């Protein structure tokens, strides 16, 4: 268990204040459902639409039936482990990780059709064979995956839903933290990146009170700087240009 000292105190203090001020509401109203509410986007170009019609069906996960015994069965060529990225946006991070780790399978969940079209173009261009895609409800996907099967879950610059009445749409909720604990292997990781201080505080507060996770930070630089080989997304670069510093939070699933 990490001892929170002065090296990590700034963000920990923020989380504690945020928890006292806001998270004392009854979270029973934060029912599991769609954590995404903005699926519309720009009109697709002809080739993008063609990829959505013809390539996506070969890569898309169908969760209306039972899950496989292990998610590695979803990939050909075979993989050794599987990771999940939720809300991959333009796909920069997911593509880079898939290329860097060919023996790992990746599931990318994204509700925006424009994001799907962008990543399909990169998958076609790079001939990537270790990515599967999911365009539905992330909560339903988390409930479907086999227990203790994922090596890692990434949530990179998610929609912060800043208005209080929309907080129930944030991905990080107590119920979803429990779902991640069920899905992750022992010592698997949940990694979270955001340049929105209030969402960082929200996430840290939820994970610090979760019995199945440990925050891995031992010094301030562990959350102030990206982890090694992190691929900055287009949104991340935009945030830096505008003077917003992201936090890079890592939480490890405790062994049973």
UniProtKB/Swiss-Prot annotation:
Which residues take part in binding S-adenosyl-L-methionine? 85, 110, 137, 159
Active site residues per record? 159
Function in brief: Catalyzes the formation of N(7)-methylguanine at position 46 (m7G46) in tRNA.
Q: Does the keyword DNA damage apply?
A: no
Superkingdom field: Bacteria
Entry's family note: Belongs to the class I-like SAM-binding methyltransferase superfamily. TrmB family.
> Which Gene Ontology CC terms are recorded?
tRNA methyltransferase complex
Group of enzyme by EC: transferase
Q: Which UniProt keywords apply?
A: Methyltransferase, S-adenosyl-L-methionine, Transferase, tRNA processing
Q: Which GO terms describe its molecular function?
A: tRNA (guanine(46)-N7)-methyltransferase activity
Q: In which pathway does it act?
A: tRNA modification; N(7)-methylguanine-tRNA biosynthesis
Positions contributing to substrate binding: 163, 195
EC number annotated for this UniProt entry: 2.1.1.33
Q: Does the keyword Zinc-finger apply?
A: no
PROSITE patterns per the record?
A: SAM_MT_TRMB (PS51625)
Q: Which organism is it from?
A: Rhodopseudomonas palustris (strain HaA2)
Name this protein carries in UniProt: tRNA (guanine-N(7)-)-methyltransferase
Q: Which reaction does it catalyse?
A: guanosine(46) in tRNA + S-adenosyl-L-methionine = N(7)-methylguanosine(46) in tRNA + S-adenosyl-L-homocysteine
């Amino acid at each position: 268990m990490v001892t929170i000292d002065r090296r990590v105190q700034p963000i920990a203090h923020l989380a504690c204040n945020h928890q006292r001020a806001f998270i004392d509401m009854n979270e029973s109203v934060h029912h599991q459902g769609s954590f995404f509410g903005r699926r519309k986007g720009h009109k697709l170009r002809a080739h993008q639409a063609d990829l959505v019609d013809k390539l996506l069906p070969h890569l898309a996960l169908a969760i209306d039936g039972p899950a496989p015994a292990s998610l590695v069965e979803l990939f050909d060529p075979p993989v050794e482990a599987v990771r999940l990225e939720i809300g991959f946006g333009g796909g920069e991070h997911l593509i880079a990780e898939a290329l860097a780790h060919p023996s790992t399978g990746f599931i990318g969940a994204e509700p925006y059709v424009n994001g799907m079209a962008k990543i399909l173009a990169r998958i076609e261009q790079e001939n990537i064979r270790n990515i599967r895609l999911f365009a539905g409800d992330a909560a339903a996907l988390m409930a479907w995956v086999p227990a203790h099967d994922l090596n890692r879950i990434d949530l990179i610059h998610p929609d912060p839903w800043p208005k209080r009445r929309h907080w129930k749409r944030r991905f990080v909720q107590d119920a979803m933290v429990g779902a991640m604990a069920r899905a992750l292997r022992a010592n698997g990781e949940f990694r979270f990146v955001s340049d929105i201080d209030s969402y960082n505080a929200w996430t840290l507060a939820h994970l610090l009170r979760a019995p199945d996770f440990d925050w891995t930070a031992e010094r301030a630089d562990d959350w102030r700087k990206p982890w090694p080989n992190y691929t900055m997304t287009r949104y991340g670069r935009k945030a830096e240009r505008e003077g917003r510093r992201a936090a890079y939070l890592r939480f490890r699933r405790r062994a049973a």
